[in-house]
């Protein structure tokens, strides 16, 4: 059996993690198994399902330069105790170089960097991320990307021109999102939204998802449509700030913050919407 060690932050319901689970559920797990390397200690929403399917979850120190000696020591122990690992795939953006360098030092032959974004977030970690990005080429030997722009961002124009990367689409289970009027009516009834014009958004509360602009837009929509109602699915560090913003805009009673819910519930709620809005930012 082939075991692939995926480096992520933790296995919560976020875009990259959900994409991995979509693939994990459909591969032949008698031939290939996924294990997960998490640099956050908190439990993830998918942990129980991963263990039920035969996967392992390892926790490491955080991804920052001060903790790297401890991180490297932890990784060495994992590889020594699991000599079957021949493939490591990093999904952490530029910080994925931590896992890839540890894999290289421990002689793991296949080291994949999987690009998921077309830009690098400009926050206080930016200088560290730029150094990590510069170190990626010497530590990875396989290029995966969800799209051309993400490949261009992390691998450079020459790699894209040579087509020297694997394009891995973010597959979804489309049948789960087929419209069902019965589900639509039930969701609306349960949430007292039978006669509302629902606008929906699914996304983690983080800067890239641009909830600030979304709420500004909906505030204007609500002035023109007295029946408009915004439903936000997801969780994240900016959720409380967005609740405060909705209150300040005077639309608190017209916005429902659902929080983090199971994927099945998400697909049902999406079916209850009339419109969806996704004002993402490239940071």
Model-assigned labels for residue ranges:
Residues 2, 6-70, 164-165, 237-238:
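N-terminal strand-loop element at the rim of the active site
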Residues 14-22, 197, 201-220, 230, ...:
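A conserved mid-protein helix/loop that constitutes part of the nucleotide-sugar donor-binding site
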Residues 36-44, 172, 202, 206, ...:
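Glycosyltransferase donor-sugar binding loop
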Residues 75, 178-193:
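A short helix/loop element that forms part of the nucleotide-sugar donor recognition site in Leloir-type
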Residues 90-96, 115:
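Short His-centered aromatic/hydrophobic patch
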Residues 105, 126-143, 163, 271:
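Membrane-proximal helix-turn-helix segments that form the acceptor-binding/catalytic region
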Residues 140-178:
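A short, active-site helix/loop in glycosyltransferases that binds the activated sugar's phosphate group
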Residues 243-261, 270, 277:
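Nucleotide-activated donor-binding/catalytic signature segment of Leloir-type glycosyltransferases, i.e.
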């Amino acid at each position: 059996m082939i075991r692939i060690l995926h480096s992520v932050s933790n296995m919560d319901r976020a875009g990259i993690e959900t994409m991995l689970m979509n693939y994990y559920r459909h591969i032949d797990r008698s031939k290939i198994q996924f294990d997960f390397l998490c640099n956050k200690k908190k439990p993830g929403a998918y942990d129980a399902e991963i263990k039920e399917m035969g996967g392992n979850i390892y926790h490491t120190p955080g991804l920052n330069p001060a903790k790297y000696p401890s991180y490297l020591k932890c990784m060495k122990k994992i590889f020594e105790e699991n000599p079957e690992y021949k493939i490591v795939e990093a999904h952490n953006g530029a910080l994925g170089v931590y896992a890839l360098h540890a894999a290289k030092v421990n002689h793991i032959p296949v080291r994949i960097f999987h690009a998921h974004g077309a830009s690098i977030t400009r926050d206080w970690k930016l200088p560290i991320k730029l150094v990590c990005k510069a170190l990626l080429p010497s530590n990875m030997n396989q290029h995966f990307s969800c799209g051309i722009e993400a490949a261009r961002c992390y691998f450079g124009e020459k790699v894209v021109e040579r087509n020297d990367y694997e394009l891995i689409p973010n597959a979804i289970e489309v049948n789960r999102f087929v419209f069902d009027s019965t589900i639509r009516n039930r969701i609306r009834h349960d949430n007292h939204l039978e006669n509302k014009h629902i606008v929906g958004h699914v996304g983690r509360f983080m800067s890239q998802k641009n909830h600030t602009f979304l709420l500004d837009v909906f505030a204007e929509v609500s002035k023109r449509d007295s029946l408009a109602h915004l439903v936000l699915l997801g969780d994240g560090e900016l959720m409380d700030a967005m609740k405060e913003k909705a209150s300040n805009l005077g639309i608190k009673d017209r916005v429902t913050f659902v929080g983090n819910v199971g994927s099945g519930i998400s697909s049902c709620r999406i079916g209850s919407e009339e419109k969806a809005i996704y004002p993402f930012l490239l940071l």
